[in-house]
Amino acid sequence: VPGVTEAGSNSNNAVNLLDIYPTLTELAGIPSNPAVEGNSLAAMLRDPSVRKSEPTLITHGFQNHALRDQRWRYIRYADGSEELYDHKNDPNEFTNLAGKKKPAEQITRLKRFLPEVNADPLRASRKRGKNKKP
């Protein structure tokens, strides 16, 4: 971003498209609608070493969620099964650590960020055979 970001800088933070609107409103100096989800990335644009305080949420289909922070990816499927990957030691996600004793605290920590409410998939998507409710 001209005038904000140093040329050639980058950040390894996982971000979400929901963060774009609050970022643009902050950079433009206009109020953001509080009903809109997302967090401004302006601080990260100014200083790429800034770390996000919360993991990024990714949802695919109905009740299938993944959470990603600097080191970990936690996945929870609609059927209740789980996956956990340590990107520091396993960047290609070959070893699922869910169910192992040592990283259990990471699952507990990341689970706090799962959505409490899941909206029904769009009816049009269900008609095409996608996003079927279990």
List PLM regions with ranges.
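Thiolate-centered catalytic microenvironments shared by cysteine-dependent enzyme domains
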Residues: 1
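Electron-transfer interface patches adjacent to heme c in soluble/periplasmic c-type cytochromes
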Residues: 8-11
